[in-house]
Structures are given as C-alpha cells and as structure tokens.
C-alpha cells in the first residue's frame, strides 16, 4: 500500500510548552538541555522532518523560545488552563486546515508522527486522531481539524479542562505506534532527565 502524502501547507505543528512545570521545580521544561540541546529543539527537529509550519505555545520565556525561529504564542486564556488552552491558541494562530500537537517535554518524538496521525484521520473520516503506543493513548500527540476551535472555546468557557472529554464530543481516530512506545516518554523531573540522558549516551537515537 502506498504511503499517504502529507499536504505540507495544510498542517501546522503546535508545540505545547505552556505548562507550569511544577514537578521540575518550575523550570521551563522545553528549555532544559538534553544531550546538549533544549528539549524543545528535539521536538522541533522531529516535526520539521515532516512539515514546514510550526508554532510554539509558551507562557514564559517567550523571547528565548523565539530564538528557535518560529512564532511563539501564549495561551489565549489566562490561568495555566492545561493543554487544551494551548491547543486553542494554536488553532487561532494557524491558518492551515489541520494542526498537529506535541508536548515540549517528550523529546523522543515518533518517526512519521504526522503521517501516521494524518493517515488515521483520513482513513476514519475523523475530526481528531490521537497517538496510541499499544497500551494507552497519548492525547497531547494529536492531529485535528482547525475548524474545531469554536467547539473548543465553548468547552473551555464552560469551565471544562479535561482533554479526553472534549475529544469524546468529536469523531476520534487512533494512530498506533506499537513499534515506538519510547517515543511518548516524557520528562517531568530532573531525575527523569538525567536518566534519559544516560540512556541516550549508551544508545544514541
């Protein structure tokens, strides 16, 4: 079966870096070094291998994030409301038909993340496609129609925050990455960062 061709101008990547990083002692996770590069740089490189247009959603250190060469957009709603607020910001700022999201603290991004998510969405005629590692879903790795923004804003304005509940309101497809379960590993503490860096020194990626 031939591979689906990604329409590059129809998908914008949104890197979610807007959290408080409380378990990291408040240090901005996307800017923490892993193998000599900020974690967000690893995510940028992976997404740029598939698509051209990227946005970075951040609520702190905006000037530092801007040095990576992509537009930096804060949450459109105050209060650190979680990933949905960042997704809404990305939808509003993008001009493409779809957005694809990935968090800044998961630097081992899957090969062909965008293509597999896009294939699942098109195949199922879905509104949103979400990554699944074979054991569980990873809802912040997702591709979705940008015209879902009004629905998302209604959800947030109603005081709702849970990403799974909003997804449940729409047609959902699942893209499986059983061959790359490590791709969804995230770094939430200095200890986890040190552990991952040690592993990468032994088995470079």
Question: Model-found features: residue ranges?
Answer:
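Nucleotide and nucleotide-moiety/phosphate-recognizing core
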Residues: 3-160, 165-183, 190-204
């Amino acid at each position: 079966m031939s591979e689906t061709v990604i329409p590059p101008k129809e998908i914008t990547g949104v890197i979610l870096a807007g959290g408080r990083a409380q378990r990291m002692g408040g240090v901005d996770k996307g800017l923490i070094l892993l193998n000599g590069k900020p974690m967000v740089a690893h995510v940028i490189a992976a997404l740029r291998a598939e698509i051209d247009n990227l946005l970075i959603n951040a609520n702190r250190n905006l000037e530092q994030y801007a040095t990576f060469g992509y537009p930096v957009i804060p949450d459109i709603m105050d209060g650190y409301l979680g990933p949905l607020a960042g997704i809404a910001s990305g939808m509003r700022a993008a001009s493409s038909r779809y957005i694809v999201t990935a968090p800044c603290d998961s630097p081992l991004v899957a090969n062909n993340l965008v293509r597999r998510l896009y294939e699942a969405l098109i195949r199922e005629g879905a509104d949103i496609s979400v990554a699944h590692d074979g054991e569980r879903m990873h809802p912040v790795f997702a591709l979705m129609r940008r015209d879902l923004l009004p629905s998302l804003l209604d959800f947030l304005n109603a005081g709702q925050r849970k990403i799974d509940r909003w997804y449940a309101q729409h047609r959902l497809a699942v893209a499986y990455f059983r061959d790359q379960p490590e791709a969804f590993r995230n770094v939430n503490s200095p200890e986890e960062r040190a552990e991952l860096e040690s592993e990468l020194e032994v088995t470079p990626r």
